[in-house]
Amino acid sequence: MEQFSNADNQQASLCELSWLGGIVDGEGCITVSKRVGNRTASPIVTIVNTERKLLDKVQQLFQKYGIAYYVRVHKQLNQAECKRPLKQKVEFVIAGHKRVPRFLDLICPYLISKQPQAQLLLHFCAVRKDRVHQAFLQIDKEICSKLWVLNGRGTKW
């Protein structure tokens, strides 16, 4: 059996992480999720897709790199209303002030279109690190508003 060098492993890791960064750029969302009914928010990164092979690869890489996540499977629309069969939509969710920075630190060098959102969310996590369960300060709200504008979601609390 052929032995792989450490350089080969590093090259494979670089390739995997750059691929994952591209998936987040194209299929992901990097934001702060507001909780309805109260004034708290959580950093969140999601990847949504319907392609089983792609989803399996994302899941494999999350497990390989120790990324904590959960999965949401979205209900399909009524098939009778659609002209063609719909694929099952699956969403991988990474949430939290510790999990999100750990993931973004891995993929940030490979992001292109979502690089500004990633940098803002990393800043948000750093600013909120020691006061996760405390009231939001003006700086927290400003960071969230900038993120929401970048994502085309508005700025209201």
Question: Can you describe what each PLM-predicted range is?
Answer:
Residues 1-157:
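Internal intein/HINT superfamily modules and their associated LAGLIDADG
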